[in-house]
Amino acid sequence: MERQPTTDRMIQEYVPGKQVTLAHLIANPGKDLFKKLGLPESVSAIGILTITPSEASIIACDIATKSGAVEIGFLDRFTGAVVLTGDVSAVEYALKQVTRTLGEMMRFTACPITRT
């Protein structure tokens, strides 16, 4: 009897660590985006962060609002999602401060900031 080749199986499981998995700046978004997100149209930039553990999103908002003229557009402490609003330079600086502080001070793994 001929032996059948065995199939290796791999189970991948996400185990959250201390991570900033998304840090993105949307400069001058379209008005439709503001409307769909329920954000004020008076700002010129949106910053988006996704952080684990999700409780660190509260720390991220504290860092961001203390860094300059940004507002919290949305904070979900259960999923780690953060949306910041303000002018482009203020939101960009806030994202830099959040990723730097979480990365260097708190030893999170932080992704680079992306921009559109």
Swiss-Prot record:
GO biological processes: propanediol catabolic process
Cell compartment(s), UniProt: Bacterial microcompartment
Keyword Transport in annotation:
yes
- What is the protein name for this chain? Bacterial microcompartment shell protein PduU
Q: Which family would the database say this protein is a member of? A: Belongs to the EutS/PduU family.
Predominant localisation class: other
Q: Name one GO cellular component term.
A: bacterial microcompartment
Quaternary structure annotation from Swiss-Prot or TrEMBL: Homohexamer with a central pore lined by a beta-barrel. Hexamers pack into a loose array. Interacts with PduV, probably via the beta-barrel, which is predicted by modeling to be on the exterior of the BMC. Interacts with shell protein PduA.
Q: What is known of its domains?
A: One side of the hexamer is concave which is lined by hydrophobic residues, the other side has a slightly protruding, 6-stranded beta-barrel.
Q: What does this protein do?
A: A minor shell protein of the bacterial microcompartment (BMC) dedicated to 1,2-propanediol (1,2-PD) degradation. May selectively transport specific metabolites. Not absolutely required to make artificial BMCs. Proteins such as this one with circularly permuted BMC domains may play a key role in conferring heterogeneity and flexibility in this BMC. Expression of a cosmid containing the full 21-gene pdu operon in E.coli allows E.coli to grow on 1,2-propanediol (1,2-PD) with the appearance of bacterial microcompartments (BMC) in its cytoplasm. Overexpression of this protein leads to multiple smaller structures which appear to clump together in the cytoplasm.
This protein's UniProt keywords? Bacterial microcompartment, Transport
Keyword Transport annotated: yes
Q: What PROSITE patterns does the record tag this protein with?
A: BMC_CP
Q: How is it used?
A: Artificial BMCs can be made in E.coli by expressing pduA-pduB/B'-pduJ-pduK-pduN-pduU-pduT (in this order); pduT and pduU are optional, while pduA, pduB/B', pduJ, pduK and pduN are essential. A construct with the reversed gene order does not make BMCs. Ethanogenic BMCs can be made in E.coli by targeting pyruvate decarboxylase (pdc) and alcohol dehydrogenase (adh) to them. PduP(1-18)-Pdc and PduD(1-18)-Adh strains targeted to the BMC (PduA, PduB, PduJ, PduK, PduN, PduU) make significantly more ethanol than strains where Pdc and Adh are not targeted to the BMC.
Q: Which InterPro entries match?
A: BMC_CP, BMC_dom, CcmK-like_sf, EutS/PduU/CutR
* Residue span, BMC circularly permuted domain: 9-108
Pathway, per record: Polyol metabolism; 1,2-propanediol degradation
SMART domains, per the entry? BMC
Q: Which cysteines are joined by disulfide bonds?
A: none
